């Protein structure tokens, strides 16, 4: 009887944990996919290259696509998140600079409903890059 009770409690706890994670996932998706975002800060190899992203706006969709529009340029990429690891991955396949600089797995360092700060270790140059996105 005790084993059955313990097994039931473990199952209940795991179910609740999955439910909470799903709710967190849904909340994140609602914030990210609602509105347009822009690069408010980007530091690469200790150099501020934020101005390279001037004029670009990003639209994240629930189907994990992201569209970057700047001037006459529109590029579609993919994005994904991992709530447990606090990471977001972006991939603009075949994109040129500056969008190619976003093709990383970013660790979220700070987040609000209208801004996100993140960092990543550049796997090519072995440096830490910093990104700040703000909602328009």
Predicted regions and their residues:
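C-terminal motif of bacterial Sec signal peptides marking the signal peptidase cleavage site
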Residues: 12-15
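Lipid interaction determinants
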Residues: 17-78, 83-136
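Sec-dependent signal peptide recognition
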Residues: 2-7
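N-terminal leader/targeting segments
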Residues: 9-10, 127
